[in-house]
Amino acid sequence: MELTLWTYEGPPHVGAMRIAASMQGVHYVLHAPQGDTYADLLFTMIERRDQRPPVTYTTFQARDLGGDTAELVKRSIRDAADRFQPQALLVGESCTAELIQDQPGALAQGMNLPMPVVSLELPAYSKKENWGAAETFYQLIRTLLKPQLPPAGLSKPDPKRWQEQGRRPRVNLLGPSLLGFRCRDDVREVRVLLDELGIDTHVVAPLGASPEDLRRIPQAEANICLYPEVADSSCRWLERQFGMPTVSTVPIGIGATEMFCRELQELLGLEPTSQGSGQSRMPWYSRSVDSTYLTGKRVFIFADATHAIAAARIASRELGFEVVGLGSYSREQARAVRAAAEELGLAALISDNYLEVEAAMAEAAPELVLGTQMERHSAKRLGIPCAVISSPLHVQDVPARYAPQMGWEGANVIFDSWVHPLMMGLEEHLIGMFRHDFEFVDGHMSHKGEKPPGPEAADPITLAAEANGVDEAELLRWAPSGQAELSRIPFFVRGKVKRNTESYAQERGIINITDEVLYEAKAHFSR
């Protein structure tokens, strides 16, 4: 167990709550003390939902531990079943209740309840939230579809059978859930995309689905794994048991959306059509003269695996950025992240320690950070522009407006989200150049917050040095004359000049960097 200020994922029972709250007709009985009810706020405050998640807590107290807590569990299960009458009942325990070992799932299965009971065994001290969500979704699908399992040896259904039946092909969208990043809008955008291809959306799950909807999953020709963190294990089980192929390309970015369309058309036997990338303004801007300002920008990426891999592909192939750091907190998807990093000549950072991520960020010295809510805080401390691309998120990252990440419109949203911080940085530099004119005041420098004074404001060089075990006395120092001259260099090349000057000084054993050293370094690198 670790005491920390921040965690990227909650315990696995929070993942189970995400699945229950995402669906209709499902209720979750959670064996937990009163203190574990905090998770309700994640849905009412961050997701802006008008109702609590469908969870009943046993809420045992210290005095209950001397008695029969198993009877308390059974009473809570019976009351929840009678009151809510769900189509399916999930039963599990929180990390605290796991220590008591009451095994509420086994108790529920022995109560002869009139609805399907799914017993959840979520090891809280070795697994985390996304795994808990994936395991809950998998167990729910497996329990509900068990009566429909085909006999062994039966041939797999043909994905092109829709042609003989005189209808449009059908696919399922699996993985979107509450507390995911823009899942609601992604589903809407992908539905439109599929309709343009002549494909019907059969079931969307878990978001908005009921247990009866899950029973209809095998009627579709294929499954689309939109969010592997939640749906990968379920898609693989459906492929093994029902022979349903899985479309694994996640349509985030222009290139991935085109690949997604081609993969679906080949799988379902549809006629290839002209791609709809013209609906996005991102390719047009990427070919424009204005976009040359973005070329070569150094970007650091840390997010869940799905969005981190997609962001790395978009940044390197579609926007011409230089990816200088790539990582994820998703240990279950670490292999895919490492493969994506190797393609870029990087070593992936797989960690759930935000301080380690911040140190790596500082060492990479990027001009843009793409990450979670925590990376936004870290980037602000370091004075680096940042865009949030993944959960965990804050309420400001759950907009009321339509803002998908997938499909053609998603490419527009991504482009705006990533480029605007860089453009604002250019504006910041121009304001800084003229800030001494009478019509400008310091209060105008507002958009990204200056680094606070004092020891709390960690310098990027210091953080990188600490990460590498370098003594602070051995660090390079910028003299006031050198800092003044560096501040006159335009924002969009200042980082490169700073790195080159420090490299020049280190090679020559210069510790104090003055304006003269900066001039010498500039002359050296311009030869």
Swiss-Prot record:
Its cofactor is [4Fe-4S] cluster. Substrate binds at residues 425-426. Pfam families: Oxidored_nitro, PCP_red. One of its GO terms (molecular function) is metal ion binding. [4Fe-4S] cluster binds at residue 36. Belongs to the ChlB/BchB/BchZ family. This is Light-independent protochlorophyllide reductase subunit B. The gene is chlB.
